[in-house]
């Protein structure tokens, strides 16, 4: 199967694959048909009703506005270091500019995949389980620590993280694409130990999930209104999706059916670097880096992956070590 991501997300794909096998065994062996899908339009109308709820909207807006009130304007960080922001400041004639330009002309994207071995993957998963952390938040910590390291120890880091709005049975079985991205902004000092930093990110993400019905475009609009940033600028260079897709399907007639998923670039994107992390059938994980070739090369992805792994495995081995010490030692 080759699906367009605009039509279906990974959660929808899981349901579809299971249903396809159930349909096969229904026609081949006479087993029951898969359960009826929930009508997509019905779920969409519920979404629109939530969005139109003035009290809910006010709470969501307050959450995002409070972040800006407390922390002020975000600060751009780039995997290529502070020279990128300095270049934007020169182009716009503003030495205090805190956002950088989005590439709008040369949008070609290349892909570089790296495979993490099963035993190493299991170490990360065990750490998450033992400390009640999600893999997403551990990955966010790895990326933000690298960004901090290559940007002279910058403490204020923002990464765009994709989430799936499928918390109910109806949402899970309604098909379509229900992914949405929100900025995960944390200010973490170098004295903070690795585990505490992971919990800081997790606490922020948990709060974001509570307000995930909010339109992310409104967050951008509010920042433009407050900080008067130039058109086509952003505070983020990195985007993350973690997809815990199963690598096998259990079917009552067919037994265990192994499956393999791979993401393809459509050739163009306005995101400078978009990392998708998924599980592989051998028990490992695949790190798929999609990057704009106008400004990035494969070597940039090699450095990012290499240092992400150094940071993560140093951190899980010595969770009491400070973020500053980890950045120095790796």
Protein language model annotation of sequence segments:
Residues 14-20, 155-162, 196, 265-329:
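Extended, hydrophobic beta-loop-alpha segments that form or line the acyl/peptidyl-thioester binding
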Residues 53, 58, 65, 71, ...:
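Flexible, non-catalytic linker and terminal segments flanking ANL/adenylate-forming cores
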Residues 1-18, 106-152, 191, 196, ...:
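Acyl activation and transfer enzymes in specialized metabolism, enriched
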Residues 51-61, 75, 127-136, 150-260, ...:
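His-Asp-centered acyl/peptidyl-transfer active-site segments
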Residues 40-109:
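Short amphipathic alpha-helices and their capping loops
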Residues 20-31, 68-75, 146-151, 186, ...:
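A generic secondary-structure signal for well-formed alpha-helical elements
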Residues 1-42, 300-314:
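Active-site-proximal acidic secondary-structure segment that organizes catalysis
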Residues 103-107, 174-179, 280-284:
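Short, flexible turn/loop "capping" segments at secondary-structure junctions
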């Amino acid at each position: 199967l080759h699906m367009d991501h605009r039509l279906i997300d990974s959660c929808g794909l899981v349901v579809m694959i299971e249903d396809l096998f159930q349909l096969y065994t229904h026609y081949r062996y006479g087993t029951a048909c898969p359960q009826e899908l929930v009508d997509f339009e019905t779920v969409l109308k519920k979404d629109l009703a939530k969005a139109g709820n003035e009290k809910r909207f006010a709470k969501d807006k307050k959450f995002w506005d409070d972040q800006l009130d407390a922390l002020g304007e975000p600060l751009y960080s780039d995997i290529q270091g502070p020279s990128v922001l300095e270049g934007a400041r020169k182009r716009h004639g503003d030495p205090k500019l805190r956002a950088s330009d989005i590439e709008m002309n040369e949008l070609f994207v290349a892909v570089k995949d790296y495979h993490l071995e099963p035993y190493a993957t299991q170490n990360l998963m065990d750490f998450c389980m033992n400390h009640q952390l999600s893999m997403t938040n551990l990955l966010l910590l790895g990326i933000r620590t690298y960004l901090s390291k290559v940007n002279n120890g910058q403490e204020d880091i923002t990464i765009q993280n994709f989430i799936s709005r499928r918390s109910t049975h109806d949402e899970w079985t309604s098909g379509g694409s229900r992914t949405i991205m929100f900025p995960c902004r944390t200010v973490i000092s170098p004295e903070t130990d690795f585990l505490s930093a992971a919990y800081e990110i997790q606490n922020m993400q948990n709060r974001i999930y509570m307000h995930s019905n909010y339109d992310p475009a409104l967050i951008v609009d509010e920042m433009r209104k407050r900080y008067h940033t130039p058109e086509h600028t952003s505070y983020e260079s990195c985007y993350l999706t973690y997809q815990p897709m199963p690598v096998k399907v259990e079917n009552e007639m067919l037994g265990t059916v192994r499956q393999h998923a791979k993401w393809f670039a459509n050739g163009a994107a306005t995101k400078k670097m978009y990392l998708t992390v998924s599980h592989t059938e051998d028990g490992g994980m695949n790190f798929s880096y999609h990057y704009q070739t106008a400004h990035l090369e494969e070597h940039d992805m090699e450095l990012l992956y290499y240092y992400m792994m150094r940071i993560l495995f140093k951190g899980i081995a010595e969770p009491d070590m400070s973020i500053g010490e980890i950045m120095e030692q790796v």
